[in-house]
Amino acid sequence: MNTLLQTIADGDPLSRPEAEEAMATMMSGSARDEHIAALLMGLRTRGETLDELVGFTKTMREFAVSVETDDPQTIDLCGTGGDGASTFNISTTASFIAAGAGATVAKHGNRSVSSQSGSADVLEALGVQIDLEKEGVEHCLHEAGIAFLFAPFFHPAMRHVMPVRKALGVRTFFNILGPLCNPAGVTRQIVGAFDTSTAQTMVRILAELDADHVITLHADDGLDEVSISASTTLFEYDASDQNPVPRSHEVGPERHDLDRASISTLEGGTAQQNASILRNILSGEDQGPRRDVALLNAAYALHVSDQYADLDACLEAAAESIDSGAALDALNTLASVSKEAKSE
């Protein structure tokens, strides 16, 4: 580790193998806290290179508890958090809509970062058993077509760096890595970022690590979701393209014939309040902006699953998922199956 720290102190980049070595040293518990702090702050000050981030991500994935899925088109919707907007749980709601439309969803998440209610918090309030280990999650994926992968259970090696991260109290490259390290090994993702530059970096990392179809994004109103209150910058990588490279484009709700709405209409609250909002959307009771933003994010998730012809078809499928009751069924089934898995 001393040699790697000297390289950083000299202002030189780590090679990809050196980044892998540094991460393996941290994840195995072999690094001293002061060395971890020096590495994190040295790279934060200088700025990480793509090779460094790819090496870190690759190794963090190797240290995760692996979850098997039968469906190679399994998707995930997650984000870095930290957008400070305190919206309801948009990507979690969209996950159930996507599952109701036929996608297999391995939802990777944690407790709250910047709001009162993270994905784990709202799912717990909805009666989903979140503290499932590998076998329980695999059971949910097989029986319900959707599962929640509670990050602390699947990234146990992170305990070696958590005290330093908490003590530093600033964003580091670990804030970027988490959403890129789904334990189910998904190659199809929607990943929201806390700024546009980070979204662009994340798509390049995923492209280097054999993604099939991914979109990273950041909205002009600050959301790490596809927004209906502002335009959203998307960075898309599709390995099936004739010339597969990350491409960027901007979308507003008008592109999908949806009305713009103030970001205040998307405001959430406590886990219990967000659970009520989510259930009202899935039941079809809420026909307003919250439904629209959930549909939009579900549509882009279905888009990266490549199960529908185009985005318009994805949006129609998302609406049908709610209107047919399939999205609500996906929630109720996960709640039931997750409890079965916990009791086994």
UniProtKB/Swiss-Prot annotation:
Enzyme class, first EC level, given as a word: transferase
Binding-site residues, anthranilate 2: 165
Pathway: Amino-acid biosynthesis; L-tryptophan biosynthesis; L-tryptophan from chorismate: step 2/5
Binding site residues for anthranilate 1: 79, 110
Pfam families in the cross-refs: Glycos_trans_3N (PF02885), Glycos_transf_3 (PF00591)
Protein name: Anthranilate phosphoribosyltransferase
Family as reported in the entry's similarity comment: Belongs to the anthranilate phosphoribosyltransferase family.
